[in-house]
Each structure stands twice: as C-alpha cells, then as structure tokens.
C-alpha cells in the first residue's frame, strides 16, 4: 500500500557499493550514517545478508534494520513524502476484536506528543553535526579511502559501547522501560545513529530525560511507536516468511505480549495473545509453519473444540427423540406409567406387582393406559362372552334422568309414543377424516392416508399411543353432561370390530376402543342417557367407505372372503350380545344395531336380509331385550313395505337422510329446502313408520344441518364438492342454487360460526327444527354428529353453543306447519 512503500527505484539494493568508489550526496551520506549506526535489532551473525526490503518491511522499527555492509543499506529517506497517507494504526491488518471508538480512544494515548517528536529530531541533527536544513557537511575526501575491515571494526566497537551505556542510563532514568511511550530502549535506538557517546549524553541532559520519563509514566503502558516526521508511520502488510535471523515475535511489543493487543486472540486467563503465526494465520497468510517461534500456534477455541460441540449436539438431539419414545415403550411393555398425572391419579393406590406377568404391557395393564380416569384399575381377567370387563366397577345406579320429559333409566322408555332425541358420537371410536381432519392433514396425497386402515399402517408402532390419545381427548365426560343439558336423551355410539378383535393382516389398534366404549356407556348411565350401539365397521367392510374403516372394495357378503367375513360378523355379534345381555345394561343399552349402512345398492339384497334375520335371532337368543335396528341400505323406503315382513320381533328400521348428497336436493334454495322436509320427508317418514301401511317402527339415525357438501373430506380425502363442481372427474357441473350465476363458493359455507349472519343462523336453526319435527312423526332421531374439529354445520355441540340450535332439543321454536320465518338478505350461494 502507498503509505508503507519505500523509494527503492532511486538506488537498487543490489548495487555493490563496497567494490566501487561512489560519490555520495550529503543527504545520502547522512541517511547512510543514520542507518549504519543503529544495530539494536541486528542479527548476531556478521555475515547476514539482507533480503529485499519488500520481504520484511512489516516491522514498526524497520528503518533501524542493518546489514553487515553499510553500503548495502543505502535507502532514500524522504521525510516530506514517506508518510503522506493518513496515519494508520500499526496493527490494522491484525485488528479483529476491537472496533470503533473504543479501540481508537485507547490508541490515541499512544501517539507521541509533538514536542517529544521535535526534541528527538533535534538530537538526531545535533549528533550528526548538522543543525539546519542543509544537512551534514560534505564527507572528507580521505574518508572514502578507508578500508572495509577497519571501518567495520570501528563501527562495531562504537556501537557496543554506546548500547551498553545508553541502555543502562535510560532504563534507570525512566524507571520502566517497557511502560514508556519513548522508553530508554527506544531512545537508545533513536540516538544510536549519532556519532559520539559523550555528545549524546551532554545534549540530552538529565532534566529533559526526567521530563520525558515522567510523561511516559503518566501515559501508562503504551506501545512503542517510532516517529520520524510530523505524521505517524504506517506499516506494510506482514510477509508470509520472516527474514532469516529475526524472530517473528517482534510483531508485537512488550506490552502486547503481556496484555494482548487489539486483534490478538486472548487466552482464558491472563497472558497475551498467540504468537505471530496465529496472527498471520488469522489473515490467511500463514503456511502452517512454526519455524522461528518458540511457541506453537494455537488455533481458535471453535477450531479446537468444534468436533466436541457437534458430537454433544448430536447426542442431545438423539436423547430428545429416544427418551420420550423409551418412556412410552416402557409404559407399554413393562407397566410403567405417568401415575402422577391427574388422568392416572387412581393408579397411586395400585401396586404394579398386582398385574400378572402375562398381562403386563397388554390392554389389560392399566399402567399402560393413556387415561385411567373413572376406570376401575384393579386387575381382572374376567370376561363375558369372551370380552373383558377390565375397567368396570362392580356396582351401578340406573336412577338418573336426562330431563323431566323422559323417564329415568330404571323405567321403560315409551318408544313409539315418546320420540327419541339423540346424537351420534361419530369420528370417535370409529375414525372419520372429515370429523377429525387433524389426523390426516399431516400427510400428502401421494401417501394415500385416507381412512383408519391406512392411518394405522402409516403410524405403525405409534398407532396405539396416537389413537388412544384421540379416544381419551376427543370425547370426555363433559360431553355427556352437555348432551344432557342440551335436552337430548339418547346417544348413538359408533365402534368397529377391532374394538373386539383383529385378524391376520389388520393394521388396526385392537381392543383399546372397547374400554372407552364401556366407559362411555357408564357416563351415559350417570347422566340418564340411553344408548344405541352402532357397529360402524364390520369384517370386510359393508360399504367400502372410509367410515367403515377401509375405503375401497366391499368384502362383506361379497368377493373371495365374503362368506368368511359374514361368519366373522356373526361371531362378533355373538360376543357382543352375550356381553350386553347382562343385567347392568338392560336399562341403558336400549337399542342394539346390527350394521351401519350396508350398501344394498351393490350387495345382493337377499343375502343382506338373510344375514339380518340370522344375526337378530342370534342376539335375541343370547338375551338381548333391546330394540334391534336394521339399516335401509339406501333403498327407497317404499321398497321396504314388502321386505322382512316376517321378521323377528322388536326390530326397528334405521334410515339416514341428508339433502347435500342428493344432486336434486342440494340445489334447493333455503326456503325450498325447509319446505321439502316439512312436505315430502315428513309424510315419507310418517308412512314408513306405520306397520300396516309401511314397514313399521322407523328412526332417522343420521341427519345434519349441513346445506352444502363443502366440509373438508366429507366426500372422502382428496375429493372435491358437488357445490363447486369439483366432485366428479368427468362432470364440472356446480350443484348450488346460484350455479347459473357462477357464484357457488364454499368460502362462506366453511366459515367459522362467529361470522355467521343472523339470517344464516335463523335458517340453520329452522332447517334443523324442521327435520326434528319430521322425524319425530316416527320413532325419533339422532343428529350426526355431536362434535367435529372444524365442520361447524355437522356438529350439534357447535350449533348449540353458538345459538343456531334450540337451547333444549325438546323445546324447538319451529315445527312443520308453522310459517317459515324470513331469512333476511341471506344469499343463496351458501
């Protein structure tokens, strides 16, 4: 850089001045005399030959370097131009840690005062015998003829005497040579270029030396900075290799070695920074060699320990994964439990030793249960019909009454004269994607997670813990209390065959749902609610829909394993009926379902009817006194007038009615939809309910307030909607009242209830109450469903809590025959 260069072009360093008789100009002679007389940092080797200046001109005191041959060290020293550039700190190339004003404030105290610089210059010229601007007098002619050996001997003798006396004198006078701004050593070097020891001492004087020493002491420990002109000196960049005979430790001053200067990497406690190799390495110039230094380069803290940090970071991550998994697995396999949690607090009085070894880690081990609330955790392996009673209390009470309009459980319910007002617990023990989309949202469409079968496969070993957590949290005791408070009196509980047993190849979580089914029945008992058991998924799948457990092929009464699955489903009912024929259930389980929604549009109708008759006879033979329900199979209700006319007693037909899955009904506007229910559905249900003109006792086991099919996954995972015309891959027709205007949208239909307009809430409640009125003309109804994660128009709980369902189900504000209220300016596109 310009501020650190020298004028090497004026006289080549390779000129052999010793072999010639050069003619010196006064200025050259003066500079040569100056350089030749300072040997403070000379090598001990008199045969040392200088390398080119650009190799080692990085030291702060480089103008004091000397050769064996003073003629080789002739350099032009132009005081007017050598330091034209703005002053730069000598350690700028090394500065990495100290920045800005903080560093600069510390450095400014190290700059010599102008009076000290002037005094140093005066001594230089006085000792050379030139007091003025013209430089020294011409060299005597006989001086040019001196021999090389004699001149060298004289010079070395003078240097040695001067160094010894001056160093001792100034160190004593200054008190601390290493602490002064212009210390004794530095002045010895500066004055070493002058001829005559006595002249130097006489001109210096004791008073001035004391004054300078005092200033140095007041300034504190400062770095030694030579100043040869009005402006401070800049340094060249450090070379990669130090000159032979020099120690690389000269890069830093004594103060830096003791305290560590700016840009130097500090050790943990005390001491200075690393040797020069570390500093040069920091600038990217070090070749890895430590020659010339007695101290090995010390790498940075991160470089020394980064592998250790990485190793421990990996261990921490692995531990964060392994520990929770290990705890869960230990609970499952070895009977450990989070017994301190409130949901497992009843385990505190139970000894783990009370669980037999063969039962530990199984569904019979309460220490592996996610939730033990309201379960009897005393171990038992007793069964009824081959089904465990583990978790049940030995006593019960059937005196509870849901509301004043229905009898308590220990009195018979007047079916036929008193309508059922109930709700389903869909998506709970039989998982449905549209009810609990959170279990499916984390997967991409390419993974094909579309039902409980594929979900269980995907979850693998974690399926039991994930699904049991859903069982324990999606429906709780509070829900049964709310169902009662909403004026409802029946609960239809969905479950599937894997709650009882699984078969080879099944990925389902076996038997855990059974425990939650039994507890749910006990909660119903507590709040006076009667139960309708609903097998939602039977072996092989009865309809191939996702809520049967496995979407796709129907394998029940159909296909290669059709007969096998027929037999399995009968075995299931054999066990179930034996269990629920117990006295403890005769007052609470009052409706017993055979199978949910067998798709009789695809299955052989006669096979379904024969199985229905056989299954009904079986369960009644086993002691079931409850009503047995058979689903209409999606056949027109008028076809049932002639089916199962000679059937077992105490049977009930179950029909499910929705307007959103019928393209002829989903397009109706709000008012017309209410009219459809009160005119068409009302009479249809009323007629089928009469044995003489229809089939006989009929209930509507499923219906909802949904007026669109916009809810996420309601048409299967990844399937579009009829409302927006995305349901079919071949037909883009939009099925909504405003399809001709192109305004069909699911945005408003899927909005949260908090933004519903009063007109929309009025419609939704009127729409619900019209259906209640129609179905109560028969045996009654069960709303689909009680709770959903996000599908607001499918959740009775959401509607009830947000003011678009009657406060009490038995006290609606609208009945068929009443004038349909105005819905205000409610748009028809939602």
Swiss-Prot record:
Extracellular topological domain: 329-830
Subcellular locations according to the entry: Cell membrane
EC number(s) stated in the UniProt entry for this protein: 3.2.1.58
Any one GO CC term of the record: plasma membrane
Region described as Disordered: 1-91, 127-163, 260-297
Enzyme class, UniProt record, top EC level: hydrolase
Biological-process GO terms, alphabetical: cell wall organization; glucan catabolic process
GO molecular function, one term: glucan exo-1,3-beta-glucosidase activity
Membrane spanning residue stretches: 308-328
SS bond list: none
Chief localisation class: membrane
Sugar attachment sites: 341, 376, 381, 393, 397, 546, 558, 610, 669, 689
Keyword list, A-Z: Carbohydrate metabolism, Cell membrane, Cell wall biogenesis/degradation, Glycoprotein, Glycosidase, Hydrolase, Membrane, Polysaccharide degradation, Signal-anchor, Transmembrane, Transmembrane helix
Biased composition (Basic residues): 147-163
Protein name: Probable glucan 1,3-beta-glucosidase D
């Amino acid at each position: 850089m310009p501020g650190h260069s020298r004028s090497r072009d004026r006289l080549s360093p390779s000129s052999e001045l010793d072999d010639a008789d050069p003619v010196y100009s006064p200025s050259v002679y003066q500079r040569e005399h100056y350089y030749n007389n300072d040997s403070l940092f000379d090598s001990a080797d008199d045969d040392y030959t200088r390398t080119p200046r650009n190799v080692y001109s990085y030291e702060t005191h480089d103008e004091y370097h000397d050769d064996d041959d003073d003629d080789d060290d002739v350099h032009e020293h132009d005081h007017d131009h050598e330091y034209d550039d703005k002053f730069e700190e000598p350690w700028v190339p090394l500065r990495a840690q100290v920045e800005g004003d903080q560093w600069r404030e510390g450095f400014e105290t190290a700059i010599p005062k102008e009076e000290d610089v002037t005094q140093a210059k005066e001594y230089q010229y006085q000792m050379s015998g030139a007091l003025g601007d013209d430089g020294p007098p011409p060299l005597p002619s006989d001086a040019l003829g001196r021999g090389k050996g004699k001149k060298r001997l004289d010079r070395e003798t003078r240097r040695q005497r001067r160094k010894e006396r001056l160093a001792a004198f100034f160190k004593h006078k200054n008190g601390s040579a290493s602490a002064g701004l212009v210390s004794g050593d530095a002045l010895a070097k500066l004055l070493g270029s002058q001829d005559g020891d006595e002249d130097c001492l006489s001109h210096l004087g004791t008073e001035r030396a004391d004054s300078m020493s005092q200033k140095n002491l007041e300034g504190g420990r400062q770095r030694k900075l030579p100043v040869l002109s009005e402006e401070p000196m800049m340094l060249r960049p450090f070379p990669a290799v130090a000159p032979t005979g020099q120690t690389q430790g000269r890069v830093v001053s004594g103060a830096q070695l003791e305290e560590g200067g700016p840009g130097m990497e500090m050790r943990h406690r005390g001491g200075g920074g690393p040797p020069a190799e570390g500093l040069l390495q920091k600038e990217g110039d070090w070749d890895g060699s430590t020659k010339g230094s007695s101290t090995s380069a010390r790498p940075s803290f991160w470089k020394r320990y980064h592998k250790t940090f990485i190793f421990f970071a990996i261990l921490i991550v692995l531990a964060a994964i392994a520990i929770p998994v290990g705890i869960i697995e230990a609970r499952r396999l070895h009977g450990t439990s989070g017994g301190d949690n409130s949901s497992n607090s009843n385990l505190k009085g139970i000894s783990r030793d009370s669980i037999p070894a063969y039962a530990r880690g199984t569904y019979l081990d309460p220490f592996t249960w996610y939730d033990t609330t309201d379960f009897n955790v005393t171990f038992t392996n007793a069964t009824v019909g081959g089904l465990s009673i583990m978790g049940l209390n030995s006593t019960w009470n059937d005196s509870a009454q849901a509301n004043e309009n229905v009898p308590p459980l220990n009195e018979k319910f007047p079916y036929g004269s008193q309508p059922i007002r109930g709700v389903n617990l869909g998506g709970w023990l039989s998982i449905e994607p549209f009810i609990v989309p959170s279990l499916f949202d984390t997967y991409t469409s390419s993974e094909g997670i579309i039902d409980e079968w594929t979900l269980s496969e995907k979850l693998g070993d974690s399926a039991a813990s994930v699904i049991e957590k859903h069982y324990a949290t999606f429906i709780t005791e509070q829900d049964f209390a709310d169902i009662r408070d909403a004026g409802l009196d029946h609960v239809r509980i969905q479950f599937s065959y894997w709650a009882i047993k699984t078969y080879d190849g099944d990925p389902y979580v076996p038997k855990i749902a059974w425990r939650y089914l039994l507890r749910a029945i006990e909660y119903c008992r507590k709040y006076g609610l009667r139960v309708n058991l609903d097998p939602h998924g039977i072996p092989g799948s009865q309809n191939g829909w996702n809520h049967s457990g496995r979407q796709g092929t129907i394998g029940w009464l159909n296909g290669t394993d059709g007969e096998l699955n027929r037999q399995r489903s009968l075995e299931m009912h054999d066990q179930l009926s034996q269990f629920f024929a117990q006295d403890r259930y005769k007052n609470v389980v009052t409706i017993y379902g055979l199978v949910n929604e067998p798709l009789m549009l695809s299955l052989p109708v006669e096979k379904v009817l024969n199985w229905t008759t056989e299954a009904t006879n079986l369960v009644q033979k086993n002691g079931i006194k409850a009503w047995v329900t058979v689903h209409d199979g999606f056949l027109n209700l008028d076809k049932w007038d002639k089916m199962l006319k000679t059937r077992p007693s105490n049977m009930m037909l179950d029909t499910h009615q929705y307007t959103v899955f019928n393209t002829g009904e989903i397009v109706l506007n709000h008012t017309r939809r209410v009219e459809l229910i009160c005119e068409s559905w009302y009479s249809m249900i009323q007629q089928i309910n009469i044995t003489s003109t229809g089939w006989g006792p009929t209930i509507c086991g499923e219906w909802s307030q949904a007026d669109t099919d916009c809810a996420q996954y309601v048409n299967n995972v990844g399937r579009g909607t009829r409302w927006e015309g995305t349901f079919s891959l071949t037909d883009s027709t939009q099925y909504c009242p405003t399809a001709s205007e192109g305004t069909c949208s699911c945005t408003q239909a899927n909005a949260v209830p908090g933004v519903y307009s009063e007109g929309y809430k009025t419609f939704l409640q009127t729409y619900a109450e019209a259906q209640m009125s129609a179905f109560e003309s028969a045996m009654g109804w069960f709303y689909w469903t009680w709770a959903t994660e996000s599908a607001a128009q499918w959740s009775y709980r959401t509607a009830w809590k947000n003011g678009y369902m009657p406060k009490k189900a038995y006290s609606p504000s609208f009945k068929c025959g009443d004038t349909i209220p105005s819905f205000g300016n409610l748009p028809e596109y939602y």
